[in-house]
């Protein structure tokens, strides 16, 4: 007998519940939504627009286990966004931080029209380079 599929809402709720011990409820729900959208191969707005649609994401259970063990979402997904671009990340590669994105935006604004010489030390994911 085939196993019934979950709705997007139920999948997000179940994953968020597993993460609530590690994160506050709002953060747990945000992580759950991002993971569900990623593994369903849809955008976050698409996930939210039709929460009663069935979700076909067999990898989500394994992702849930990794997330519940405290592994960062970016490592579980294998990617992280920086300045609207996706960069591959895995254990051993630093995850691009929002603060670094803000710093890079500040430098770009301040140095516009000039030819600065910059040095990126400890590159990590290479998103600044």
PLM segments and residue spans:
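SAM-dependent Rossmann-like transferase core, predominantly class I methyltransferases
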Residues: 62-129
């Amino acid at each position: 007998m085939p196993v019934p599929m979950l709705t997007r809402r139920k999948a997000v709720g179940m994953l968020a519940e597993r993460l609530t011990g590690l994160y506050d409820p709002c953060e747990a729900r945000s992580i759950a939504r991002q993971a569900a959208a990623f593994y369903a191969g849809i955008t976050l707005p698409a996930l939210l627009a039709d929460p009663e649609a069935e979700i076909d994401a067999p990898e989500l259970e394994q992702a849930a286990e990794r997330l519940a063990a405290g592994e960062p979402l970016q490592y579980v997904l294998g990617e992280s966004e920086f300045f609207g671009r996706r960069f591959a990340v895995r254990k051993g590669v630093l995850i691009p931080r929002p603060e670094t994105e803000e710093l890079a935006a500040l430098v770009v604004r301040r140095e516009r029209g000039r030819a600065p010489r910059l040095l990126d030390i400890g590159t990590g994911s290479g998103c600044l380079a």
